[in-house]
Amino acid sequence: MVKVNADYLKLKAGYLFPEISRRITEFSSKNPNANLIRLGIGDVTEPLPLACREAMKAAIEEMGTEDGFRGYGPEQGYKWLREIISENDYISRGCEISAEEIFVSDGSKCDSSNILDILGKENKIAVTDPVYPVYVDTNVMTGRTGEANSVGEYTGLSYIPINSENGFEASIPKDKFDLIYLCFPNNPTGAVATKEQLVSWVKYAKENNSLILFDAAYEAFIKDESIPHSIFEIEGARDCAIEFRSFSKNAGFTGTRCAFTVIPKSLKGKAGIETVDLWSLWNRRQSTKFNGVSYVVQRGAEAVYSKEGKIQIKKLVSFYMDNAEIIKSNLTAAGFEVFGAVNAPYAWIKTPKNMSSWDFFDFLLEKANVVGTPGSGFGAAGEGYFRLSAFNSRENVEKAMERIVKLK
């Protein structure tokens, strides 16, 4: 009989969002007339920006001609897209990131998982808690952890708590870690990292020869001009960080699939006594395992940076952030303790009356027909919290707030 990857069997339970779907399905089967409002999974709802749609339509027509047809593209992404990303997202902010250091992909979720392909299993790993489940689960699946304890913490991983008690600030560890996952603006808490905090992290990483995996998927939602949008705004980060970005939330590409990862050519790692550059390893990995993002989609992503695209993206981001403000203001006025939802599209809510995260999930589902995300699904430190997403229509967000406020 064929042998399986037994590390998958160590996963504590079903992935968070499939478990949510299971509970919704069970509830809906018993309550077929319930009008559910979903503020759980962070999927966008508004149409693709016009500039992106028009660019993709033109690309489709181009592909219908002999001269314009394209087959396999470069695994790293087309040069014209990488150059415009470099100019707009990095050079404009004083970051020395070249087009060659940008790898276009079909999602930051994939990249933050696949990056483990080029990193050794012996690395000591730290994650924030609560945390985007993919960081933890992919380490489990690739044999980098032991078993989980009763609250879902795995041996082999170290957890850095971020909560209301510490102002949602990820404290610099006293111990040495080789690999550190940071996500700011943070999913799920909505917290941000100041420049001073990121300077401290870069200093720590350089002193300990650590690698920071920095997820900046929500950078477009930052309103505070003092908050960095990229780890590479910090001096020295080129030597200790990889950054993941995505078009999913700012441009509505969750169903279109386009993202990118930045790996500076100066970034080094160890293979025994030999020093190797991570850029070359990732380039080799992508060339072997990835055929690139479609030409049509990359033209759509390119349009994000056009004059019209920038206006439309700004409007789209503002729409979701207005939703976030509606959630935060309504729930705060109703007596809930609400964090985030200022520089990120997520509201992180303290559950009332010491309810558990899943009990509050079931309570809102049954009493208000509103779906959110239990904080405990993001880690032990998320217990007693609940995440609501701003990704929905204005009508649904306002209606959901009316329902929840009535319960209070």
Swiss-Prot record:
Annotated GO MF terms: L,L-diaminopimelate aminotransferase activity; pyridoxal phosphate binding
Pathway: Amino-acid biosynthesis; L-lysine biosynthesis via DAP pathway; LL-2,6-diaminopimelate from (S)-tetrahydrodipicolinate (aminotransferase route): step 1/1
Gene3D superfamilies: Aspartate Aminotransferase, domain 1, Type I PLP-dependent aspartate aminotransferase-like (Major domain)
Keyword field contains Transferase: yes
Positions that bind pyridoxal 5'-phosphate: Y72, S108, K109, Y132, N187, Y218, S246, F247, S248, R257, N291
Key word Transferase present: yes
Catalytic activity as recorded in UniProt: (2S,6S)-2,6-diaminopimelate + 2-oxoglutarate = (S)-2,3,4,5-tetrahydrodipicolinate + L-glutamate + H2O + H(+)
CDD domains for this protein: AAT_like (cd00609)
Names of the cofactor(s): pyridoxal 5'-phosphate
Principal EC category: transferase
UniProt-listed Enzyme Commission number(s): 2.6.1.83
Residues involved in substrate binding: Y15, G42, K109, Y132, N187, N291, R387
UniProt keyword annotations, A-Z: Aminotransferase, Pyridoxal phosphate, Transferase
SUPFAM superfamilies per record: PLP-dependent transferases
Quaternary state and interactors: Homodimer.
Name the UniProt record assigns to this protein: LL-diaminopimelate aminotransferase
